[in-house]
Amino acid sequence: MSSLEISSSCFNLETKLPLSPPLVEDSAFEPSRKDMDEVEEKSKDVINFTAEKLSVDEVSQLVISPLCGAISLFVGTTRNNFEGKKVISLEYEAYLPMAENEVRKICSDIRQKWPVKHIAVFHRLGHRAASLEAVSYAIDTLKAKVPIWKKEIYEESSSWKGNKECFWASNN
């Protein structure tokens, strides 16, 4: 049984990485610039507790926004053992009204602390602290060490942006 949590501080539809493999194959969703400009998006929180199999792609689509530049995700899975015992499955229960209320409070706390556009939280079980620390390290280290530039393309012009967090870009 897999589980998943996804929060978003957005996604930029103009990002093009021609040498990279696509994240979602055969994606039929390609909004036009007109559609993107006309959309006034309100922030949303999507909360779901389910016993059904979860799809990273489906949940990711819930948090994509043309106003933002990234989607942050955490995917938790079930370990195959615990304290030397083989785990074959998990069963879980929740008092849904209370669980949903508590997750809404968490979403509210997130919005007070960070500029997040959309949040989707799908119920998960398991330990996540080490995984989240590893993801944070990967992102911070990538930004500090990997020479990546982006080109922002506007309606009338474009501009190359260097990674200000990279050690080689600092003004010493």
Swiss-Prot record:
Any single biological process term in GO: Mo-molybdopterin cofactor biosynthetic process
Location(s), subcellular: Cytoplasm, Cytosol
Highest taxon, organism lineage: Eukaryota
Protein name: Molybdopterin synthase catalytic subunit
Record's keyword annotation contains Phosphoprotein: yes
Enzyme class: transferase
Organism field: Pongo abelii (Sumatran orangutan)
Sites where the protein binds substrate: H127, R128, K143, K150, K151, E152
